[in-house]
């Protein structure tokens, strides 16, 4: 994702990230008075490795007939497929069936009803929802898909103003990043520094010429161990 998430690499075992759920309290006091004691409260965001993988096998005949580097082409394709799968899971992951939990279904993430590709007022509603959670304005982005971008380029903020919702790669002053991982009529807005990507490994690629040697085919297997977490769910709003 091109939204500057927090990256944790080289992890081992399960990981717990401390999260402050309430702050201490300040008081005005009289001369020689003492403020009342207060304490922060903490909980933890837990991350456990989830494995995403893909494999293909290709024949000896394909190697003989092709003038290109087939193995390199297949490796590149597998890497792109896994990256695309991870991008989708970061947004829509169910948290079940060995899949990480994505932003959309994380408890505490704000929601906003979106009509078709959204009105200017609906986008302002998303911004207000996130700002009320004291998210970091400097790290806020919109994620929209290419169809939404096209529609919003001709959607006026108000009638007969010639001012459009999407201008200069921004929506209302916030960067708008286009990702076709977003379904039509879905919009994600928030402080993406609060989204954590944990990686227990790089992309592990294995070339196996032996398993199907009698058939003359070669297997390429790719595996990667990752998990996602949202440190401050209120820093996001999902529109749909």
Which positions does each model-derived feature cover?
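Extended oligomerization regions of viral-like shell subunits
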Residues: 11, 16, 94-227, 232-235
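Acidic/polar, low-complexity extended loops/arms that serve as protein-protein interfaces
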Residues: 1-137, 177, 183, 229
